[in-house]
Design a protein with these regions (language model features):
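Active-site neighborhoods and metal-handling regions in enzymes and metal-associated proteins
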Residues: 1-219
């Protein structure tokens, strides 16, 4: 994205005609669906930083700490360990706040028996990673453990279903049907996943509405 001023400056400096054709945007976005080997390397580097940060937070999270402080610790660790920026604003939420898909970290203190959800990603030379993980603090209830294991099983089943040449919505259906079949009909609020690259949300997406066929090189 650019400002109008930047657009005019670019047009003047290059002495070119800028085409106002909406379809060109779709052509470019489609080309970006397939990542080059160099792009894949950058995304893997971003994800390696994210993985390392997650393992770090497992040693940090404990009862009495505040969501906002933990968010800052997570951000600092990624930036200190090779991230050239944050892929997006980190979400770190506990207890009831963690049940919100896009929670805002606040001064909520972590308690024994809480789930803590982290949605975060590193940027590396312009390319993004994105990972969501939920961890338990101390002993949790049987219901919490049941739901956690169900979501984990649905995630792993979705991953196992991915291969080239299938509709994206068929992957979403694998995980969604497991959740619904366990008695949580209507509780799957989002799509299963989305592509990423230069932007944190790119196409195609593992959602009920996306019929795009998967191809090698998509992330």
């Amino acid at each position: 994205y650019m400002t109008v001023e930047s657009l005019f400056s670019l047009r003047k400096a290059l002495n070119v005609t800028i085409l106002d054709e909406p379809y060109l945007n779709e052509v470019i976005l489609h080309q970006r669906c397939i990542k080059s080997p160099e792009e894949l390397e950058e995304i893997r580097a971003a994800q390696a930083i994210t993985d390392k940060a997650f393992l770090h937070m497992l040693d940090i999270i404990k009862p009495g700490l505040v969501e906002k402080d933990l968010q800052l610790e997570l951000d600092y660790f990624m930036l200190k360990n090779g991230a050239t920026g944050l892929a997006f604003e980190t979400i770190l939420a506990a207890g009831a706040n963690g049940s919100m898909p896009h929670a805002v970290p606040g001064m909520n203190k972590i308690k024994e028996g809480d789930f803590v959800t982290m949605d975060f990603g590193a940027a590396h030379n312009g390319y993004c990673s994105d990972m969501t993980r939920t961890v338990a603090v101390g002993k949790i209830s049987e219901e919490q453990e049941k739901v956690y294991n169900l979501v984990l099983a649905a995630q792993l089943a979705g991953i196992d279903a991915v291969r080239a040449g299938i509709p994206c919505n068929s992957v979403d259906a694998v995980s969604r049907n497991m959740i619904y079949g366990a008695g949580y009909e209507g509780k799957f609020g989002h799509g299963l996943g989305h592509s990423l690259g230069l932007e944190i949300h790119e196409n195609p997406r593992f959602s009920p509405l996306c019929t795009t066929l998967t191809e090698a090189g998509m992330v």
